[in-house]
Amino acid sequence: MFGKLTLSAVPYHEPIVMVTLAVVALLGLGVVGAITYYRKWTYLWTEWLTSVDHKKIGVMYIVVALVMLVRGFADAIMMRGQLALAEGANHGYLPPEHYDQIFTAHGVIMIIFMAMPFMTGLMNLAVPLQIGARDVAFPFLNSLSFWLLVVSAMLVNVSLGLGEFARTGWVAYPPLSELAYSPGVGVDYYIWALQISGMGTLLTGINFLVTVFKMRTPGMKLMQMPIFTWTCTFANILIVASFPILTAALGLLSLDRYLDMHFFTNELGGNAMMYINLFWAWGHPEVYILILPAFGIFSEVTATFAGKRMFGYKSMVWASAAITFLGFTVWLHHFFTMGSGGDVNGFFGVATMLISIPTGVKLFNWLFTIYKGRLRFSTPILWTLGFMVTFTIGGMTGVLLAIPGADFLLHNSLFLIAHFHNTIIGGAVFGYLAGFAFWFPKAFGFTLDEKWGKRSFWCWLVGFYMAFMPLYILGFMGMTRRLNHYDNPLWKPYLVVAFFGAVLIFCGIACQLIQLFVSVRNRKQLADVNGDPWEGRTLEWATSSPPPFYNFAELPKVQDVDAFHDMKKAGTAYRKLPAYQPIHMPKNTAAGFSIAVFAFVFGFAAIWHIWWLMAVGFVGMIGSFIVRSYNQDVDYYVQPEEIEKIESARFQQLAKQV
C-alpha cells in the first residue's frame, strides 16, 4: 500500500541527521506555537498565503531563499569541516554516503532553492514598480509559481528524514544516477524536486516577459526601462528557452528509472553523453539566469549611490543581449574532456572567451558611472564594490578555463570549484544581498541597520577569500573535487584555512540575522517616511514604502530612463490628484496553494512508488486547476473613496517632513 516506504526509511542510525531533525522539529513547533499564541493564522492566510500581490509574493520568495541559504550553508560548512579533518588515518566525522548526500544537496539547494528564489523575489518586488504596472500579467500564475517552489523545497528537506537524497553530485550524471548504481530514492527526490520547481520557474519566466512587453506605463519605451528590468527580461528569455531542456532531460532519466528504458545507459542504445549535453544546455544558461539580474542590481545601485545617470545605458542593454545570446553557445566548455575533438573544443573555447567582452563593457560602465560621482558608502554600494573586485578575479580564471588545453589539466579539480564560487558568490549572491539592502525599505517601510550590514559585508568578503582562494592553489596541486578523504598532507593547511573562511562567512550570515532583528526593533528610528531613502532615480521610489496594494493611484507618464529623478527635478514627484478613478485589481486566491499541495503529494508518491497516492495527487492538481478556470470571481475595482483615503494619509505623512 505504501510502496517502498517503510519504517526503515527513517535514518535512526545517523546521529547527525536525527539531531538535526529534532532541532528543526523544535523550531517548527516554536513557530507554529507563536503564530497560534498571537492568533495570526487568519491574517497569514488572507494577507500572505493566498495573496496575488507581486510585492508580498516577492517577500515570501526571499524568506524561502534565506531559509534555504541557512540549510545550504550548513551543508557547506559540514563539508569544509570534514575536509579539514579527513587526512591520512583520520577519516573525519561524516561517513562517505552521508558526505555524498550533503555534497549533492548543497549544490541543488544553493542554485535552485536559494539563488533562484532570491532572484525571483527581487524581480517580483521591483520590476512591476519599475515599469509603472499595478501587478504582473498573470497574478494567479505568480502565486502558483511560488507555491510550486515551496513544495519542491519541502521535498528536498523531507529527504533528510525519510529515505535519502541523491549521492550523485548536483548534476546527477548517468550512469551514477541510473537505477543500477542508485537504486534508492535519492535520485527520485532530486528529479521530482527539480521538475516541480522547474515548472514554477518556467511559469514565472512567461509571466514576467508578458508583464514587461504588455504592461509598461504609458510613454515608457523599451529603451527607457531601468537596467534591472532589462536584465530580468533577458534572464526570463533564458528561462523560457532553457528550462524545457531540463524538464526533458529529467523526464528521460525518469523513464530510465521507472520504466526500464535506456536513453542514458550504454547498453541497448543509450548514451550518457546525451544527458550531459542536455543538462549543460540548460545548466550554462542557468548561470546567466542567476547573474544577469545581479548585474541589473549593480547598475541600479551604482547610478543611485553615485548620484549620476548610468553611463552607457544603450551599451549596457546590448551587452546584456550579447551575454544572453552567447550564454547559449558555450555549454560544451563544461566537458572539453569528453572527446568532442579539437575543432569543436576550439569553437566553444573561443565562444566562452567572447562572453568576457560584453561583461567587460558592463564593468567599465559601472566604473565610469562612479567616476566623478559623489559616492555614498552605504551597504548596497559596498556589496557592489566587493563584487567588482571579486567577480573580475572569477572572470579571469574563467577565461583561463576556456582554453581547452588548460581545462584538460584543471578539469574536475578544486580550481574549477573556486572559479564557480568566485562568479556565483562574488557575482550573483553579492548582487542579491545588495538588492536586499537596497529594496528592503521599499518592501517594509524602514531601512536595514547600517552598522550590522557593514559587519556582514566584511565577514562575507574576507570569509569568501579565505574559503576559496586556497582552492585555486589546491587545484594546481592536483586535488580533485568530490573527495571526502585524502592522503596528501600538503593539502591539509589550505583546507584548514578554507574551513576558517567558511566560519567567517557563517559570521556574515549571523550578522545579517542580527541586522534583521535590530532593524525590526528600531524600525521607528529607521522609518522610510517619503518612500525614497536613497534618492532613487526609477519609478519604484515614487511610491510610498511599502507601496499601496495598487502601486500607483495614477499610472505615471515617462519620458526618459530615470523617470522619478526627472519628476523630482520638475517638481511633479509628489503631486496629489484632484480626483481618482477606479482601479482594476485581482482578488486573492487559494488555488495556487492547493494545486501545489497536490503537486507535493504527487511528487512524494512518485518517489516512493505509492501509485494510488500518485493518482490522488494528479487528479487533485487537475481538479484544482479546472475549478480555478471556471471561477469568474477573480477581480474587482478599488473605489475612488478608498484610494483617496490611502493617498491622503500618505500626503499628510509627507507634509510632516517638509
Curated annotation (Swiss-Prot):
SUPFAM superfamilies per UniProt: Cytochrome c oxidase subunit I-like
GO molecular function, one term: cytochrome bo3 ubiquinol oxidase activity
Main location (coarse class): membrane
Cross-link (1'-histidyl-3'-tyrosine (His-Tyr)): 284-288
First and last residue of the signal peptide: none
Chain positions recorded as Cu(2+) binding sites: 284, 333-334
One BP term from GO: respiratory electron transport chain
EC category: translocase
Quaternary structure annotation from Swiss-Prot or TrEMBL: The cytochrome bo(3) ubiquinol oxidase complex is a heterooctamer of two A chains, two B chains, two C chains and two D chains.
Protein known as: Cytochrome bo(3) ubiquinol oxidase subunit 1
Species the sequence originates in: Pseudomonas aeruginosa (strain ATCC 15692 / DSM 22644 / CIP 104116 / JCM 14847 / LMG 12228 / 1C / PRS 101 / PAO1)
